């Protein structure tokens, strides 16, 4: 069978995965293949990394080759480390194969070593072409056609050591595996009052070690960027002794695999174990997680990043010699780019510069230049060290008798991350000599004086729990006299409201009543926490990541069962109220064929047409199953049973149609690593604003907004003009730009048909 493409000049695009495998690579490969075919070009799967490029292990990709791969870990096309490609002769052999197959556009998915090799190939490409032509191995026509190699890189590495990118493919899933493992270890450690020393991967980058330490409330962490001095055993044992005196029954110590002390001497898990046993006489166990960190299904975030980076990489390599606008050109040669994640945006940065900066950071770490190494890693890396110091180091003094009081209340539906934010806010406040009270069960708790004193000790372990430890309620503040009395009786000097759209509305109501109640003239901060992701002022709310990981797990199971069953059409309903965020992200990350949301109008005729197309694709064998993700608030006229009736009428009992309402299971169990560490970051940021309102600017009633990679204070008053109160959503939603990718990645274009 031969694949035919639409008329016009077509290009050959090669995609390979190289180096260590990482979860999310398959999502990127799928995206590259389908977007290339959608644009009418040839896509080649280069198997086994650079070995396949040298040996000609290359296959023309078809649309169906990348069906049902998004949920799989590892690399579907194989990956390897290739010593031969490090040589000039090896790269020339690879170039000869590429000229032979007319592959002049290459997308490489891998770590810094793999991308460095790709950059070297691009630099030598012109010379290789001239030599191959002179040797008579390629014609003049082929030499002219391939005079330039269009190259794009995608960082696929669990180490997340690439400078200029917030995340690399695989790092988020690796953190999931680490947190899952340590959550399990904590239970057994607590039973026996043991200490666990956990070794994690990361090579010369401490991202995994440091981020995991924050998420699991580790007592101590070793990572390469800050090598400890020779007195580290005393410091470690003092820390463990302090938390034991406060009643903690277990301890977790995380050790990055590339850690040395300030003199360059390797620190290993056995050495840490022996020091603790000798000095504290505690029972210590070692857990080396190893390749477990690379295994399992990809997380939601790695699926989404892989899809988006693959799509952007295709746009980069195919922008063509004809397109000059926006392209960076040196003479006749375009500059290779690497896809980098910044906040929720994908940027295309110069590959050679990113490689140099990554090499520089690694060299500074090897030279043990801590300050410069941490600065090169970015401000977020420095902030994490600060957060860890405050939330893990016990109080050195008792709380003063007279102090300020800050209050925390949870509003709306419970979700993951609420407790993590409360935990970090409480510990930051206690370190500053400020007491914190938790208002139980929403505003009713404040009116009924149902509050609880939160201390450094009694919030221990909260970051690892989902839901709301304080109790939450869907309600807005009413009976303002009782609200004011509750604040006055507890001498509240600052208030944190954790929740979704109702939390934002609550802050707005309190601010509007300040002229009547002086006790409301206190700093107020909203921490957005809702799986609907409809809180204004932020790109992402707490709880979203945990919910989407749970949804992906369930949809994967439903999809698998649909393949081997007569029930080929699955209508899956997600939460989200009037916001279609969950449905859109679910469709993108699970390979679903359609997302039905309020923000994109769909009527009965559209659904009838969709059902007819679906039946035709199922009949032809080009589709194994059809997944339709419907947001619960997608329409007030067409509900899931109505969608089923439309499909049933078209399918005529040939294919079964089933509805699955995921319900409250979407809220998830233990919070994901992202929600834990982001909750802790937001809790710290909330404290910084309340204790020093000048940081919040002219307004002292703000939402903590995740904008790009940073957390900012966004005034509540201004946000009131940017939302639809009727439907409880912001007017502008960044994620709507991604919605067209649902169809682009699943609907095979007519121009790319298979002929027998």
UniProtKB/Swiss-Prot annotation:
GO biological process: canonical glycolysis; fructose 1,6-bisphosphate metabolic process; fructose 6-phosphate metabolic process
Chain residues that bind Mg(2+): 112
Residues annotated to bind ATP: 20, 81-82, 111-114
Active site: 159 (proton acceptor)
Chief place where the protein resides: cytoplasm
Record-linked InterPro entries: 6-Pfructokinase_euk (IPR009161), ATP_PFK (IPR022953), Phosphofructokinase_CS (IPR015912), Phosphofructokinase_dom (IPR000023), PKF_sf (IPR035966)
EC number(s) on file: 2.7.1.11
Pfam families named in the record: PFK
Residues covered by region (Interdomain linker): 394-404
Positions of the UniProt region annotated as C-terminal regulatory PFK domain 2: 405-756
Binding site for beta-D-fructose 2,6-bisphosphate: 474, 530-534, 575-577, 632, 658, 664-667
Gene Ontology CC annotation, any one: 6-phosphofructokinase complex
Subcellular location per the Swiss-Prot or TrEMBL entry: Cytoplasm
Catalytic activity: beta-D-fructose 6-phosphate + ATP = beta-D-fructose 1,6-bisphosphate + ADP + H(+)
Family per similarity comment: Belongs to the phosphofructokinase type A (PFKA) family. ATP-dependent PFK group I subfamily. Eukaryotic two domain clade 'E' sub-subfamily.
Subunit structure, interactors included: Homotetramer.
Protein name: ATP-dependent 6-phosphofructokinase 2
Gene: pfk-1.2
């Amino acid at each position: 069978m031969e694949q035919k493409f639409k008329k016009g000049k077509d290009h050959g695009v090669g995609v390979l995965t190289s180096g260590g495998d990482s979860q999310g690579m398959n999502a990127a490969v799928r995206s590259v293949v389908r977007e290339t075919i959608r644009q009418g070009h040839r896509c080649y799967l280069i198997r086994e990394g650079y070995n396949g490029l040298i040996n000609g292990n290359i296959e023309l990709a078809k649309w169906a080759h990348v069906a049902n791969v998004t949920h799989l870990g590892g690399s579907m096309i194989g990956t390897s480390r290739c010593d031969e490609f490090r040589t000039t002769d090896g790269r020339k052999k690879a170039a000869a194969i590429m000229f032979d197959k007319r592959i002049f556009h290459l997308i490489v998915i891998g770590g810094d070593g793999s991308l460095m090799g790709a950059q070297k190939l691009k630099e030598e490409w012109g010379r290789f072409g001239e030599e191959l032509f002179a040797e008579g191995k390629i014609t003049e026509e082929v030499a002219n056609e391939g005079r330039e190699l269009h190259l794009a890189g995608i960082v696929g590495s669990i180490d997340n050591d690439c400078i200029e990118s917030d995340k690399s493919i695989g790092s988020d899933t690796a953190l999931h595996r680490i947190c899952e493992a340590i959550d399990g270890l904590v239970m057994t450690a607590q039973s026996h009052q043991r200490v666990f020393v956990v070794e994690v991967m990361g090579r010369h980058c401490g991202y995994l070690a440091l981020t995991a330490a924050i998420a699991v409330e580790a007592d101590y962490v070793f990572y390469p960027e800050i090598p400890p001095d020779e007195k580290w055993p005393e410091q470690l044992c003092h820390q463990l002794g302090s938390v034991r005196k406060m009643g903690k029954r277990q301890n977790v110590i995380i050790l990055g695999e590339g850690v040395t002390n300030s003199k360059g001497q390797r620190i290993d898990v056995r050495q840490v174990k022996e020091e603790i046993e000798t000095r504290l006489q505690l029972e210590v166990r070692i857990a080396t997680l190893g390749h477990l960190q690379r295994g399992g299904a990809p997380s939601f975030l790695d699926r989404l990043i892989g899809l988006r980076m693959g799509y952007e990489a295709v746009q980069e390599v195919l922008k063509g010699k004809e397109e000059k606008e926006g392209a960076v050109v040196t003479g006749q040669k375009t500059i290779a780019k690497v896809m980098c994640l910044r906040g929720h945006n994908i940027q295309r940065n110069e590959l050679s510069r990113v490689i140099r900066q990554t090499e520089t950071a690694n060299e500074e770490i090897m030279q043990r230049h801590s300050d410069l190494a941490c600065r090169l890693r970015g401000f977020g890396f420095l902030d994490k060290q600060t957060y860890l110091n405050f939330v893990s180091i016990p109080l050195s003094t008792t709380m003063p008798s007279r102090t300020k009081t800050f209050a925390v209340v949870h509003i709306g539906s419970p979700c993951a991350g609420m407790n993590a934010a409360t935990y970090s806010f409480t510990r930051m406040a206690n370190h500053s000599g400020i007491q914190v009270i938790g208002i139980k069960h929403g505003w009713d708790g404040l009116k009924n004086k149902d509050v609880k004193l939160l201390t450094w000790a009694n919030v221990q372990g909260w970051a690892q729990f989902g839901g709301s430890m304080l109790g939450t309620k869907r309600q807005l503040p009413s009976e303002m006299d009782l609200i004011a009395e509750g604040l006055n009786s507890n001498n509240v000097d600052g208030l944190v409201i954790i929740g979704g759209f109702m939390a934002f509305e609550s802050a707005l109501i309190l601010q509007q009543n300040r002229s009547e109640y002086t006790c409301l003239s206190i700093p107020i901060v909203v921490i957005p926490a809702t799986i609907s992701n409809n809180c204004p002022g932020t790109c992402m709310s707490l709880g979203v990541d945990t919910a989407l990981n749970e949804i992906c797990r369930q949809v994967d199971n439903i999809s698998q069962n649909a393949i081997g069953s007569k029930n080929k059409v699955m209508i899956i309903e997600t939460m989200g109220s009037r916001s279609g965020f969950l449905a859109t992200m679910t469709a993108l990350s699970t390979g679903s064929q359609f997302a039905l949301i309020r923000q994109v109008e769909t009527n009965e005729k559209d659904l009838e047409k969709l059902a007819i197309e679906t039946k035709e694709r199922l009949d032809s064998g080009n589709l194994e199953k059809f997944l339709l993700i419907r947001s619960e608030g997608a329409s007030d006229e067409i509900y899931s049973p109505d969608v089923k009736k439309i499909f049933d009428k078209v399918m005529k009992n040939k294919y079964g149609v089933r509805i699955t309402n995921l319900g409250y299971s979407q809220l998830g169990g233990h919070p994901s690593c992202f929600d834990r560490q982001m909750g802790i970051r937001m809790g710290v940021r909330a404290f910084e604003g309340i204790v020093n309102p000048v940081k919040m600017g002219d307004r002292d009633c703000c939402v903590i907004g995740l904008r790009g990679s940073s957390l900012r204070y966004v005034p509540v008053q201004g946000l009131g003009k940017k939302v639809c109160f009727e439907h409880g959503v912001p007017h502008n939603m960044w994620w709507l730009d991604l919605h067209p990718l649902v169809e682009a990645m699943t609907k095979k274009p007519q121009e790319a048909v298979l002929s027998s």
